[in-house]
Amino acid sequence: MSNYSVSLVGPAPWGFRLQGGKDFNMPLTISSLKDGGKAAQANVRIGDVVLSIDGINAQGMTHLEAQNKIKGCTGSLNMTLQRASAAPKPEPVPVQKGEPKEVVKPVPITSPAVSKVTSTNNMAYNKAPRPFGSVSSPKVTSIPSPSSAFTPAHATTSSHASPSPVAAVTPPLFAASGLHANANLSADQSPSALSAGKTAVNVPRQPTVTSVCSETSQELAEGQRRGSQGDSKQQNGPPRKHIVERYTEFYHVPTHSDASKKRLIEDTEDWRPRTGTTQSRSFRILAQITGTEHLKESEADNTKKANNSQEPSPQLASSVASTRSMPESLDSPTSGRPGVTSLTAAAAFKPVGSTGVIKSPSWQRPNQGVPSTGRISNSATYSGSVAPANSALGQTQPSDQDTLVQRAEHIPAGKRTPMCAHCNQVIRGPFLVALGKSWHPEEFNCAHCKNTMAYIGFVEEKGALYCELCYEKFFAPECGRCQRKILGEVISALKQTWHVSCFVCVACGKPIRNNVFHLEDGEPYCETDYYALFGTICHGCEFPIEAGDMFLEALGYTWHDTCFVCSVCCESLEGQTFFSKKDKPLCKKHAHSVNF
């Protein structure tokens, strides 16, 4: 617990937040810091206790008084803080590096007699894996090497080996602790005596092969011969060498750490996770001997080629999808009006000999293959020719997201026999469903133009049903920006109606919708951008002075009426005589008693 002083150069923000106070029955402390802020650069930490602010004792201050005191500091902020005691950290557990130490127990000098063996070329003293340093029984289980995987279980009698049984090999006492044996070789255990014959200890049994071809039999016999003779050709990596120190005069712990590490790394090369198509070591050895190691790879390649040949090209798939998505052409009765024609989803009217503007059907929902109608304004002639699909899609028109235009649902015959909402008769055959009612297709007509609305959009207005064109002509309001009819959500502002996408903020371009907005030079601004561009910031709390807020001007700044207070006692100075020191307002009591 140490005290220290901090002097932060103004202006605000200072980069920290307070918590506590007299009203919370807890001392004022630093609750949070802003990354890279002035407080963080001054080595202020979270949890430090604030003792004084600009020379005033902070122990009796409430939270609001301390906040106003800090806000009143404009040029610089001087504070005295008390460092919070650091919580004791648990000591880290040391990580053991390197190999664990071996515990070697004293053993008698005279080692037990080791029976003579004829050869040590193929001896496998490797034991079953166990944690380092563990003590096990002297019995050793021999693990066959990959080269001896196909040796017969019983030693066969050959012309080079004696018919007498081979004695079992007893490992030295040092093998019990997981280390290689280091023993003096006696006269009867000389290297020349150890290389007199061959042995086969604990080799796996292989069943007799009776139904294989002659070539496979020869390859298997060759593998058996290499395994029994200790051939130096290995299937997985370089051959392993036993590390034995000879001609030592005393027993000691062998220093084989580097070699053991290397051999341990070689043994664990195949311990990584395998995928579903990776074979184990035994299967790879068998595949190499039988010559089938590349068979599955070729089969996998053929399968990939077959799959690739079956996948259609992107252009073909897109063309098929577009063909499937095209609706069936339906003939609809038309009246004598020269502006309405039955079109497909991608059709649009193309003006001829005029500079009219094509109006896209804004009521149409995306991904809906339905007929649409177009209307050309300021044009004297109409043409029934159909323009390309991209001619209508390339134009950017304001879209009505919440459109009022609906479409009738076509129901085939045979499912049910509803009642027509127009004639109140039973419908036999296909019918339409709209607004929760059923209609004869020939009786679902516009209330004004009497055209069928079976394949076009309709809008319900004052209890009657109108087609899209009649509703747009007689009922739909006009947008104050694009001068087009609004078929969806209407924004009413500034005594005009707007599309949602047309009534946007001038600064950020986002739709204002029903939110608060401000006008500046006749242009609408959202609340955030307006205060950022044109708003007045209070010098005390650094918040904008909104419309309707009481404010005053003093010392060349603008203040909220509640923010213009004495920097020491936080007494309101509105309408009172005040003094100023370094742009900080002071009351009469503290004008000459406080030095900044």
Swiss-Prot record:
There is a cross-link at K89 (Glycyl lysine isopeptide (Lys-Gly) (interchain with G-Cter in SUMO2)). Residues 418-477, 477-536, 536-596 form the LIM zinc-binding domain. Signal peptide: none annotated. Pfam families: LIM (PF00412), PDZ (PF00595). The modification N6-acetyllysine is found at K89, K350. The modification N-acetylserine is found at S2. Residues 2-85 form the PDZ domain. It is found in: Postsynaptic density; Presynapse; Postsynapse; Cytoplasm, Cytosol. The modification N6-succinyllysine is found at K89. Its main location: other. Residues 144-165 have a biased composition (Low complexity). Residues 121-165, 196-240, 255-340, 354-381 are annotated as: Disordered. GO terms for cellular component: actin cytoskeleton; adherens junction; cell projection; cytosol; filamentous actin; membrane; postsynaptic density; presynapse. The lineage of its organism: Eukaryota, Metazoa, Chordata, Craniata, Vertebrata. Keywords: Acetylation, Cell projection, Cytoplasm, Isopeptide bond, LIM domain, Metal-binding, Phosphoprotein, Repeat, Synapse, Ubl conjugation, Zinc. It comes from Homo sapiens (Human). Interacts with various PKC isoforms through the LIM domains. Interacts with actin and alpha-actinin through the PDZ domain. Interacts (via LIM domains) with SIPA1L1/SPAR; this interaction may occur preferentially with isoform 1. This is PDZ and LIM domain protein 5.
